[in-house]
Design a protein with these regions (language model features):
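SAM-dependent methyltransferase
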Residues: 39-112
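Short, glycine/charged-enriched secondary-structure capping and boundary segments
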Residues: 18-21, 53-55
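A short acidic, Gly/Pro-enriched loop at the edge of an enzyme's catalytic core
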Residues: 1-4
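C-terminal lobe and adjacent flexible extensions of AdoMet/dcAdoMet transferase-like proteins
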Residues: 104-151
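Residues lining the SAM
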Residues: 6-9
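A short glycine-rich, Lys/Arg-flanked "PGG" loop and its adjoining helix->strand segment in the class I
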Residues: 20-37
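Surface-exposed cleft-lining segments at the edges of enzyme active sites
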Residues: 11-17
Length: 151
């Protein structure tokens, strides 16, 4: 393929452990043509190290979302819980149900992993506006180019 996309909340980079993620990263590298591009939008592990645990709320168009972000430092794993309240409905005491564990990666880790697979990062961003990535931004968007074809 000329391009492989991995947008937020997708399966790539959102699995519980390194082994399963590395299988998917390898499939990405093998699927790309020489000179192909891979765009990845994932949560930033470096941000999680310094900002989690935390609780956030987001007022959307139709409702309010309460989120809890827990962090297992030794495993570099996010445990995420969420409760949604629709506007106009009765409010009840939230019971956060623990979601699936998600292994998060830093920019350095992703650069090293994909480098071993023949891809190099050419740009990294904090969001879709083109803002440069940093450890103080929750999202990490990376654009990778293939250097070699992995067989």
């Amino acid at each position: 393929f000329d391009v492989v996309l991995n947008m937020a909340d997708g399966a790539i980079g959102y699995l519980e452990d390194d082994g399963e993620n590395h299988k998917i990263f390898s499939v990405i590298a093998k699927a790309l043509k020489n000179g192909g591009k891979h765009f990845m939008d994932i949560m930033n592990g470096s941000y999680a190290q310094t900002h989690f645990p935390c609780k956030l709320w987001d007022a959307g168009e139709k409702g309010l979302t309460l989120s809890a972000f827990e962090w297992e430092k030794d495993r570099k794993t996010l445990i995420y819980g969420q409760v949604d309240y629709m506007y106009g409905e009765a409010l009840y005491k939230p019971e956060m149900k623990e979601g699936n564990p998600i292994r998060l990666y830093s920019l350095d880790e992703i650069t090293e992993i994909f480098g071993k697979l023949g891809l190099r990062i050419c740009n990294s961003f904090a969001d879709f506006s083109g803002k440069p990535s940093s450890d103080n931004d929750i999202q990490f968007d990376g654009l990778f180019h293939t250097r070699i074809k992995i067989e």
